[in-house]
Design a protein with these regions (language model features):
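N-terminal accessory/pre-domain segments preceding catalytic cores
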Residues: 1-64, 68, 156
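Aromatic side chains
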Residues: 2, 15, 34, 71-73, ...
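Short regulatory "switch" loops immediately downstream of catalytic or recognition motifs
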Residues: 10, 82, 132
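Hydrophobic/aromatic-rich core segments of domains that either
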Residues: 109-159
């Protein structure tokens, strides 16, 4: 089941819910939504993240080894940006390539980059971000930028 909500701009960056609908959807392949870019995990065939993902994949023995290489790449090459974390505005959208270029990021940047690296190499990866990242609603009880990965050998795992 999907939830589709339509919001109307009230003033500045404030929105009001004007329509909500639950949709029952049957997917031919349950993994398809977790293989493609979206606004939080943007990449194209020319992205730095895709090129880095390919390089890491070429050095991997299997999909689980690739996941480990991606994890180590991200934690060893991206430094946590405390100032950004303290000043990030509601509605922030991460950019995996910009995170790679700057070498810094917040939890959402780490998760978005990891998801882009994995999805670009056909590893189904789900990125969950709390509502607080994109609205003034309280955050649900999950870790900011939770990443769920599905591998052939281990099934769904959490980073």
């Amino acid at each position: 089941t999907y939830q589709a909500d339509l919001y109307e701009n009230v003033t500045d960056d404030k929105y009001a819910l004007i329509y909500s609908q639950s949709l029952n959807v049957t997917l031919k392949d349950e993994f398809q939504p977790y293989l493609y870019p979206n606004q939080y995990v943007w990449f194209t065939k020319d992205s730095k993240a895709v090129k880095k993902g390919q390089a890491l994949s070429d050095d991997s023995a299997d999909d689980l080894d690739y996941v480990q290489q991606v994890y180590h790449y991200v934690i060893e090459n991206i430094t946590y940006d405390k100032q950004k974390a303290e000043t990030v505005a509601s509605g922030y959208i991460p950019d995996p390539d910009a995170t790679m270029e700057s070498g810094t990021g917040i939890c959402f940047d780490y998760a978005s980059l990891m998801t882009a690296l994995l999805r670009s190499q056909h590893i189904p990866t789900k990125l969950e971000c709390p509502a607080s990242w994109w609205s003034d609603m309280p955050a649900p009880p999950i870790t900011p930028g939770s990443v769920y990965i599905c591998t052939r050998s281990a099934g769904w795992i959490t980073s």
